[in-house]
Amino acid sequence: MAMRTHYCGLVTQALMGQTVTLAGWVNRRRDHGGVIFIDLRDREGHVQVVCDPEREQMFKTAEGLRSEFCVQVTGLVRARPDGSSNDRIKSGQIEVLCHALNVLNPSVTPAFQIDEENLSETTRLTHRVLDLRRPYMQRNLMLRYKVAMQVRNFLDANGFIDIETPMLTKSTPEGARDYLVPSRVHDGQFFALPQSPQLFKQLLMVAGFDRYYQITKCFRDEDLRADRQPEFTQIDIETSFMQEQDIRDLFQDMIETVFRNTLGVDLGEFPVMTYQDATSRYGSDKPDLRVKLEFTELTGVMKDVDFKVFSGAAGMKGGRVVGLRVPGGARDAGGLSRGEIDAYTEFVKIYGAKGLAYIKVNARARGRDGLQSPIVKNLHDAALTEILARTGAQDGDLIFFGADKEKIVNDAIGALRTKIGHSEFGKKNGLFEERWAALWVVDFPMFEFDEQAQRYSAMHHPFTAPKDGHEDWMASAPEKCISKGYDMVLNGWEMGGGSVRIHRADVQQKVFDALQITPEEARLKFGFLLDALQYGAPPHGGMAFGLDRIVTLMTGAESIRDVIAFPKTQRAQCLLTQAPSPVDEKQLRELHIRLRNPDAAKAH
């Protein structure tokens, strides 16, 4: 006999008058006038079970129930009494009159009630098994499953083959740090956990599989943020014999299908924006287009002003000066307060800005006299006129300024733009539009200059193909080279990124030369790829999407940890299992490892 006939949350009026057997957990037990009510919960939801004292043995068992007891119930589905229905749940019109009650397993007192909301993340992650029983987490993980299934169905229908690639691979220290795995068999040598299956999926294209995908774990030993984990799940895809536009069209169709079939959402238009345009207008290569604020370019205007912060930035190599007009920010009633401006000043310092200059436009028609700011006296009339003209500022508006190296300005004022847009002020004043805002960012630079190392590094990775003809600039002017790279952005988050790959060994060698990777180093790190490219490698390209990020966006979760069953903390720890943890001396000896600071391991 089956342990249950139905899920709790799926018992509805359609089963009225039928006997059902349910299994789940006691969410609440309530005593009312000699009758016991049990809210029974499973992954599909709740159902109300009524225990009548007429069945003495069953009722006695019900009296001993506590929260989180695992029980089996057999009973009759009937309508709830008039006035007691609950429209918030699927089973809210019915209840189950209990005939038999079996305790499958009692529970100790839980660390918290499952429906408790104000829990610290430490408590939730330490008691993750209980946390995962909460309907919020169950919904998130069920949605994650549905997204993965939609992706698989779409790719299968389009001829993609699911192929696994190695988890123990070669360390290639480019970009983020690798997680290393010592080899017991090969003394002093290490595997690395993959940061991406990038090279293997390219090899699969050379091998002729034509269309590949996998939903796989990737690992990066980097500082964590709200949208990062040391291990994360990637929807990894590669295809041969497709142009860049065709690849983008295919994957846009995939994401549109996933959102439509799981959320019933139409993502609408996907505008295409160049990297240069995105960073120029929004200070970011993943702009949140729901925020209705844009940069105003002022570098040329500020070169001869007396305010050294502006003229210095405008005159330096790689410097930039921008304005950010905030409509209504200077109004006496409902504008930004002095405290808010001070808070924003501190905020931009996180991104390297030294301060945050501003001008309040009180009465534009009065010219200089209608402007309020400590910096106005250091700006000549022509500069002030140009600022007002370019920003389009009106009475009651406030203009923030960023002046520094271009990267600092873009990062600081770009983050400020997003913060203001998402603030209470921004939403009240129509600076934020509640919608799904997707776009493609294309034409990324091939290289970016690393000031510390004093050499170029790859913007995406060194296997990204340049725009046709741009390989000729790699030796003489690498900063001019544009790649066939592209990112899909949604609501200010990079959902996925990819590129057309280099499929010719001679072009790959030019990229290595531009990155100052010697032939010997290239052969040592990537010899297997260089060899493969010589065997008639096809034109190919692809993308990788962050499954964790997609589901986080869909659920509106505050943290990516809310859509992962067993995540790590921001200190890369698992509070449930207490990983990482010390290992015993015998294991270390087998791996030929001696700790340089054994006391540090004991201290943790």
Swiss-Prot record:
<feature type="binding site">
    <location>
        <begin position="220"/>
        <end position="222"/>
    </location>
    <ligand>
        <name>ATP</name>
    </ligand>
</feature>
<dbReference type="InterPro" id="IPR004115">
    <property type="entry name" value="GAD-like_sf"/>
</dbReference>
<feature type="binding site">
    <location>
        <position position="460"/>
    </location>
    <ligand>
        <name>L-aspartate</name>
    </ligand>
</feature>
<dbReference type="GO" id="GO:0050560">
    <property type="term" value="F:aspartate-tRNA(Asn) ligase activity"/>
</dbReference>
<dbReference type="Pfam" id="PF00152">
    <property type="entry name" value="tRNA-synt_2"/>
</dbReference>
<dbReference type="InterPro" id="IPR012340">
    <property type="entry name" value="NA-bd_OB-fold"/>
</dbReference>
<keyword id="KW-0436">Ligase</keyword>
<feature type="site" description="Important for tRNA non-discrimination">
    <location>
        <position position="83"/>
    </location>
</feature>
<feature type="binding site">
    <location>
        <position position="229"/>
    </location>
    <ligand>
        <name>ATP</name>
    </ligand>
</feature>
<keyword id="KW-0030">Aminoacyl-tRNA synthetase</keyword>
<dbReference type="GO" id="GO:0003676">
    <property type="term" value="F:nucleic acid binding"/>
</dbReference>
<comment type="function">
    <text>Aspartyl-tRNA synthetase with relaxed tRNA specificity since it is able to aspartylate not only its cognate tRNA(Asp) but also tRNA(Asn). Reaction proceeds in two steps: L-aspartate is first activated by ATP to form Asp-AMP and then transferred to the acceptor end of tRNA(Asp/Asn).</text>
</comment>
<dbReference type="InterPro" id="IPR004524">
    <property type="entry name" value="Asp-tRNA-ligase_1"/>
</dbReference>
<keyword id="KW-0963">Cytoplasm</keyword>
<dbReference type="InterPro" id="IPR045864">
    <property type="entry name" value="aa-tRNA-synth_II/BPL/LPL"/>
</dbReference>
<feature type="binding site">
    <location>
        <position position="501"/>
    </location>
    <ligand>
        <name>L-aspartate</name>
    </ligand>
</feature>
<comment type="subunit">
    <text>Homodimer.</text>
</comment>
<feature type="binding site">
    <location>
        <begin position="546"/>
        <end position="549"/>
    </location>
    <ligand>
        <name>ATP</name>
    </ligand>
</feature>
<dbReference type="InterPro" id="IPR006195">
    <property type="entry name" value="aa-tRNA-synth_II"/>
</dbReference>
<dbReference type="InterPro" id="IPR047090">
    <property type="entry name" value="AspRS_core"/>
</dbReference>
<feature type="binding site">
    <location>
        <position position="174"/>
    </location>
    <ligand>
        <name>L-aspartate</name>
    </ligand>
</feature>
<dbReference type="InterPro" id="IPR002312">
    <property type="entry name" value="Asp/Asn-tRNA-synth_IIb"/>
</dbReference>
<dbReference type="GO" id="GO:0006422">
    <property type="term" value="P:aspartyl-tRNA aminoacylation"/>
</dbReference>
<dbReference type="InterPro" id="IPR047089">
    <property type="entry name" value="Asp-tRNA-ligase_1_N"/>
</dbReference>
<dbReference type="InterPro" id="IPR004364">
    <property type="entry name" value="Aa-tRNA-synt_II"/>
</dbReference>
<feature type="site" description="Important for tRNA non-discrimination">
    <location>
        <position position="32"/>
    </location>
</feature>
<keyword id="KW-0067">ATP-binding</keyword>
<feature type="binding site">
    <location>
        <position position="220"/>
    </location>
    <ligand>
        <name>L-aspartate</name>
    </ligand>
</feature>
<comment type="similarity">
    <text>Belongs to the class-II aminoacyl-tRNA synthetase family. Type 1 subfamily.</text>
</comment>
<keyword id="KW-0648">Protein biosynthesis</keyword>
<protein>
    <recommendedName>
        <fullName>Aspartate--tRNA(Asp/Asn) ligase</fullName>
        <ecNumber>6.1.1.23</ecNumber>
    </recommendedName>
</protein>
<dbReference type="GO" id="GO:0005737">
    <property type="term" value="C:cytoplasm"/>
</dbReference>
<dbReference type="InterPro" id="IPR004365">
    <property type="entry name" value="NA-bd_OB_tRNA"/>
</dbReference>
<feature type="binding site">
    <location>
        <position position="494"/>
    </location>
    <ligand>
        <name>ATP</name>
    </ligand>
</feature>
<dbReference type="GO" id="GO:0004815">
    <property type="term" value="F:aspartate-tRNA ligase activity"/>
</dbReference>
<keyword id="KW-0547">Nucleotide-binding</keyword>
<dbReference type="Pfam" id="PF01336">
    <property type="entry name" value="tRNA_anti-codon"/>
</dbReference>
<dbReference type="GO" id="GO:0005524">
    <property type="term" value="F:ATP binding"/>
</dbReference>
<feature type="region of interest" description="Aspartate">
    <location>
        <begin position="198"/>
        <end position="201"/>
    </location>
</feature>
<dbReference type="Pfam" id="PF02938">
    <property type="entry name" value="GAD"/>
</dbReference>
<dbReference type="InterPro" id="IPR029351">
    <property type="entry name" value="GAD_dom"/>
</dbReference>
